[in-house]
Amino acid sequence: MAKWVYRFSEGNASMRPLLGGKGANLAEMTGLGMPIPQGFTVTTEACTEYYRHGKQITDEIQAQIFEAIGWLEEYNGKKFGDTQDPLLVSVRSGARASMPGMMDTILNLGLNDVAVEGFAVKTGNPRFAYDSYRRFIQMFSDVVMEVPKSYFEKIIDEVKADKGVVYDTELTADDLKELIVRFKAVYKEAMKGEEFPQDPKVQLMEAVKAVFRSWDNPRAIVYRRMNDIPGDWGTAVNVQTMVFGNKGDTSGTGVAFTRNPSTGAKGIYGEYLINAQGEDVVAGVRTPQPITQLEKDLPECYSQFMELAMKLENHYKDMQDMEFTIEEGKLYFLQTRNGKRTAQAAIQIACDLVDEGMITPKEAVMRIEAKSLDQLLHPMFDTDALKAGEVIGEALPASPGAAAGKVVFTAEEAKKLGKGGKGERVILVRLETSPEDIEGMHASQGILTVRGGMTSHAAVVARGMGTCCVSGCGAISIDEEAKQFTLGGYIFTEGDYISLDGSTGKIYKGDIKTVEATVSGNFGRIMAWADEYRKLGVRTNADTPADTKNAVRLGAEGIGLCRTEHMFFGEDRIPKFRRMILSDTVEKRVEALKPIGEFQKADFKAMYEALEGRPMTVRYLDPPLHEFVPTEEEDIKALADDMGLTVEEVKAKCEALHEFNPMMGHRGCRLAVTYPEIARMQTRAVMEAAIEVSEEKGYEITPEIMIPLVGEKKELKFVKDVVIEEAEAVKKEKNSDIRYKIGTMIEIPRAALLANEIAEEAEFFSFGTNDLTQMTFGFSRDDAGKFLDSYYKSKIYESDPFARLDQNGVGQLVKMAVANGRKTRPALKCGICGEHGGDPLSIEFCHKAGLDYVSCSPFRVPIARLAAAQAAIANR
């Protein structure tokens, strides 16, 4: 018989895939002799089984759960559902990868109308007993039955107003009894006449099912897609004996880190609340005290906590994020995990752990999430602009960086206006965030909350995303329905600008200018270690000297893709290029190309100078010509005047360039076949620039000329012959013996299939995975967004094939092309220059496929360097 349930004493940290992160760590802590409320874990396999059986828990799994409850009753000397001294449990989810705020917790399960009376007598604390029951009704209704939390919050606010009190803790036992009656009425109404369940076994099974269901709720799916977590992992369920932090002033609950998760500084960092339950801190409902206050309130608990926290860090050799509860002076740990941290903190902690002798440089490189380096290059406020800024409030600096943008009050509005929507800069202002807000948080430049501490949902999720966040600004008076808030004597409505400093917690009026960040010395150490271990080269995709310098500063070893068409769009250039496009004879085109050639040459010279001898792959003209022709009336008239044509003639010529499917039309090398004079002009510009810079600066330059969109060997040979003829003519004129290479972009499936033939003519391959993905899947990058969401929801695809290389299809073409190309030309250099070149999982694939380098946008160069090192270490 399969084992679906494990006691904490039966597992260990290595059983993470089966027990989930939380369950495996609780088992490990039990083995370490830590004070853990005992319990058991229902495995991730049971979750998979639940989905396999049409969202039903099998009899076998249910029997094992009740058997484990029997053991827990024996262990605690209490009975589940007892009317005198009931066993109460918490039910928490725990996936293999940490998914903060994604899955929901239920506390005090096992209480009912009768048990609560016995519980009040047994504890001698009626207020505590009824508070525990009202919390359970609220959580069970919200998490299990999806009755909105706001219904209950509204009743609490009404009762507090009636009684003339401010805090929940000021409500008496009788007030809480009144709440319970009203809560159950809300439940009954929402559940269409069904009463709140009184049988603890029914409560438990419904809660377990709810955790399994929550694995597939929309916000969990979004989080998984954003963090590369496979959908088939499933979640475990942890059932744990309740301990109570809300029993009075010698009880409390808190969350703490062994190092600062924002900066990485060594030392306990955290918060706690006296007389509260765990979710109060994490959910950010009340704003807590710093952990140092615990030393004054409960000194013995504090010293025991400090000692055990260090024991955990030394055991796991990493910063720990711990949840704890103190029940009447006795300390319990509810969980520990490797803490989520900012990229800045990750680097600081990794370097410190190496210096402390706890880990090796190789382990340090593996500790840092490559994708998170994005955050390090976060903007900061311009110093002068900041001096003029008006501080209107200050709260907790929950996630670093600087952000300025328009105020929005809902996640929907943030999604509509922000990143991925209209692309405007928005700041999401909320009373408190909840997991439903995750997509809106992702679309925002910054997040500002009224409630919640440094460990609230908003803080943890924002740090993970690298989004600036300021939390717990109690000075704000917010009206979410009217979409306005008041702070510092000002009223702000939707669309007004504010600025946030997530490193100091300061809130400013207006739109303060931001500047790019500078990186610290420890960043250099990590990058030096990464460069030592990686096998893949890292280049950049850049078309301007400024981008090139930036990429070189961030460690790029050259340019893997210089898109020459971007050089034609300058205000003084585009009219000349349009003139060339609309010229109707070769002679006129050659004439029109002369000034354009000079522009290109000047640009290439500036690029070669910025590269200081590093290689550059120049891609010849790729987009269809219609992309360059004018669409505005004024531009059409100017072009007509310039060429001595009528407006109608210009419009007719532009119309003639129109294509039904331009991305598969007259573009790439097809332009060079039709208009060889364009390839000649570009060759002359590249060769003259390279020769002049190598002579002036003494750099050794070998131009790499890349012909795009080749699908046939003879097509490449035709363009190559044109290039060689012009290149040799330039060498002769300049009396130069400079060497150059001619290669191609592999972006048409046919080219990948015939790579052995194409390699007879090409000296290098660069995989243009954007087009290769479009043509292999048969859908357009610009239109796929309209239907891909349905594909994710239906679990047809787990990730966007344009962001994450499709290893099963497109990846096979890449592997085949590399292998077959090298059969023809063993020293064939192969790289990748699509957007995938900056994605860590795609980089690991490139390492395994035997590519020589990846090329990505300048700001992703550090990510690629680190990901390449991690791929080399993981696959050695």
Please give the residue ranges for each predicted region:
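Nucleotide/phosphate-binding sheet-loop regions of phosphoryl- and nucleotidyl-transfer enzymes
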Residues: M1-G389, K415, E424-I427, S434-E439, ...
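C-terminal accessory/binding modules appended to enzymatic or scaffolding proteins
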Residues: N12-M15, S399-A443, V810-A827
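Short beta->alpha connector loops at strand-helix junctions that form conserved
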Residues: F40, V450-G452, S471-G474, C562, ...
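Long, charged amphipathic helices and adjacent flexible linkers at domain junctions
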Residues: F66, R224-I229, V365-G420, E424-V426, ...
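Glycine-rich phosphate/ribose-binding loops and adjacent secondary-structure elements
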Residues: K330-Y332, S434-H442, G446-L448, M454-V461, ...
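Intrinsically disordered, low-complexity regulatory segments
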Residues: A475-I476, G524-M527, D543-P545
